[in-house]
Amino acid sequence: MARSNPKPQVAGVLSALLAGAGQIYNGQRKKGITYAAVEAVFLVLLQTALRDPLYGLVTLDPVGRFVDSRHILLAGIIASFVVAIYVWFHIANIVDAASTASSIRSRHALPEDVRRIRTEDWAPMRTAVPYIYIAPSILVAFFVIVIPLAFGIVLAFTNYSLYHCPPAGRFDWVGLTNFKKLLKPGSLWQGQLTMVLGWNIAYALLGTGLAFASGLGLALILQNRHIRFRGAFRAILMLPWAVPATVSIMVFFGLFNTTFGPVNEILRSMGLRAVPWFQHRTWARVSVLLTHVWISTPFNLSVISAALQSIPDEVYEAATVDGASPRQSFARITFPLLMSVVAPILVLSLAGNFNNFGIIYLLTGGGPAVAGSRGAGATDILMTWVYDLGFRQLQWSTASALAVLVFIFVVIFSLINFKLSGVLSQLKTEE
C-alpha cells in the first residue's frame, strides 16, 4: 500500500528484506514488481545453476556435473561474479527506495511533484535502451578479459602444476604458499626473482631512456632549418616504424648471429674478435637494448618532433634578445616545454617496456642460461619468466603468482613515475 508520506528508513528496510518492497511502499508499483522479479530469478538461479559452482569454488572437489578442477574453478568464478552483480543490484535497490522516499517527503506539499516521481521518474524502456546497446560489448569484455584475468589471479592460490593437473589429478587451494616461495628471503626462488627484477627495471629504464634520447637528438637535428631535405630524412628515419616489430627483431637476430652474422663478419674483417652476442650475459643484454632502440626511436622521433613544432618561435626570439645561448634556450625553454607534453607518453612507454615480451622472447629467448637458476636466463624479464614457468616447466600456479607480482610491480612503478614526472598534478590542474 503506497504511503502519502513514506519514511526513508522504512522504505530502505523493506527493500532490504525484499527487493522492490520499498518501491511499492513509495507508490512505484511497476518498479517494485520488476525489482522483486529480478530477486526471484536470482534466488531460483542460486538454488539451481549457481549452487554447485559456488560449493565447488570453496572445495575444488568434483560436484554435480563438474569433475575437472579447472572447470569447477572457472564455473565458480563466473557464479561469484553473478552473486556480486546481484549484491550490487540489491544495495542499489535499497538506496533507491530510501532516496525516493526522501524526495517524496521533501516535496510532500506539492502533489504534482510526488505524482511525477511515482509515475514518470522511472521509464523502464527509456532507461534500459543504452544498456541494451552496450550489453554485447560488456559480455564480450567480461568473458574475454575479466574472466581470464580473474582465473589467472585465482590460480596463484592453488597448487596447479604438472603433478596436480586435471583430468588425471586435481589441484587444491594452498593459500599464499606460492607467494611465500617466491619472496622467502635467502631462497633460490627469491634470488632468481631479485636477479630478473633487477634486469627488468634496468631494461625498462635504459630502453626508455636511450630510445627517448636518440629520438630527441634526431628531432633536434631535423629541427635545424639549415638542413636541406629535412622531410626526406624524417621519412627515412621513420621507416623502421613501418616495419613490423617481429620482422625487425628477426633481422637483428640474423645480424648478431655469432657464427655468420654480418656484424661479427665485419669485426673479423677489421682484425677484431667476434662478439658472443647471445652467449655472454652482458653482450646479450646489449643486443636487446640495441634492438629496442632501433624499434622505438621512430615513435619517439615522431612525438618529439610534433611537440617541438608546437613551441612558438616568439619564445626563442625573446630568449635570443635577452642574450640566451642555444644551450640555455634548450635547457630552460625547449626541454621543460617538451617534457610537459611527452612526460605522460614516457611513463606509459616505461610501463610498456617493463612487460616487453616480444623482443626478449624472439631475440634471445631469455638466454643465455644462468647456472642454478629456476629456468630464468640472463636476459629474461618477469613476463618471459612467467611464460617459461607456465608453458615450459608447467608450473602454472607459480607462474600465476609471479604474474600477480608483476602486476603489482608495474602499478607501483607507474605511480612512482607519474608522481616524479608531475603528470598527476598536471592532470588535476587541467581538470
Question: How should each PLM-predicted stretch be described?
Answer:
Residues 53-55, 130-431:
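A structural signal for multi-pass alpha-helical bundles of membrane permease subunits
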Residues 8-10, 15, 20, 82, ...:
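Generic detector of short alpha-helix boundary/capping microenvironments
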Residues 7, 12-14, 19, 24, ...:
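A residue-level detector for conformationally permissive "hinge/kink" positions
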Residues 19, 35, 39-42, 46, ...:
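Helical transmembrane-bundle signal
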Residues 1-12, 30, 34-128:
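Transmembrane helix recognition focused on a "late"/terminal membrane span
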Residues 2-42, 130-137, 199-200, 234-236, ...:
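Alpha-helical membrane-anchoring segments
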Residues 11, 19, 23-24, 31, ...:
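Short, charged/polar micro-motifs that form catalytic or ligand-binding hotspots
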